[in-house]
């Protein structure tokens, strides 16, 4: 299992504040991911960790390597989480709401970084989000889940033509600045969605 988890598939968690160990400097945490799959190669682990900090566009990687999680910003923390996941050269990254704790400008930087890494390294990316507009602009294909089941698979560019009532309800509940509505529609859930 360890040969797949972390090595071939890595996961970027939602909020680095809760994912990083508060009593270990961030560089050592990145290096630890490398050492899990390459035991006994500590010097190489530190060099790889510094390289990954550069890959995720962290300025002054040697300085940041020594910092603790409380000493870094939210955007830096998310980049550090990405570096930790990239250090093992995975084939697939699962990103669970990786930008939900970030402000809009930092969110765009992190999304740009993820997109560049996917393109340059040929990675697969599963991007988990509740933000329909973000998914529409960032993803190629969308799997819509309801109660733990996939209810619709659709190209992101075709979301406006979704067929499943749950997907339609999610889209219709989004505020629209062009067409003001006094009340946003409420999604009417149906038991048949669990059996279809």
Go through the PLM ranges and name each one.
Residues 30, 82, 93, 106, ...:
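Hydrophobic anchor residue at the start of the ABC signature
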Residues 59, 63, 154-196:
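Short catalytic/signature loops enriched in Gly
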Residues 135-137:
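A short, surface-exposed alpha-helical micro-motif characterized by mixed small hydrophobic
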Residues 1-10, 36, 158-162:
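ABC ATPase NBD coupling module
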Residues 108-121, 133:
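Helical segment within the ABC ATPase nucleotide-binding domain
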Residues 87-91:
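A short, proline-enriched helix->beta-strand linker immediately N-terminal to the Walker B motif
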């Amino acid at each position: 299992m360890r040969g797949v988890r972390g090595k071939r598939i890595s996961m970027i968690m939602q909020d680095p504040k809760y994912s990083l160990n508060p009593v270990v400097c961030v560089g050592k945490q990145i290096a630890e991911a490398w050492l899990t799959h390459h035991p006994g190669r500590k010097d190489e682990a530190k060099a790889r960790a510094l390289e990954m900090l550069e890959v995720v566009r962290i300025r002054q990687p040697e300085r940041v390597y020594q910092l603790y999680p409380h000493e870094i910003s939210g955007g830096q923390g998310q980049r550090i989480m990405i570096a930790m996941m990239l250090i093992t050269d995975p084939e697939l990254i699962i990103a669970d709401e990786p930008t939900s704790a970030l402000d809009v400008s930092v969110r765009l930087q992190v999304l740009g970084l993820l997109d560049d890494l996917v393109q340059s390294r040929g990675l697969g990316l599963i991007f988990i989000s509740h933000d329909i507009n973000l998914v529409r602009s960032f993803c190629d294909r969308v799997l819509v889940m309801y109660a733990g089941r996939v209810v619709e698979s659709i190209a992101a560019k075709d979301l406006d033509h979704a067929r499943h009532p749950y997907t339609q309800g999610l889209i219709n509940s989004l505020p629209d600045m062009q067409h003001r509505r006094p009340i946003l529609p409420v999604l009417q859930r149906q038991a048949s969605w669990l059996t279809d």
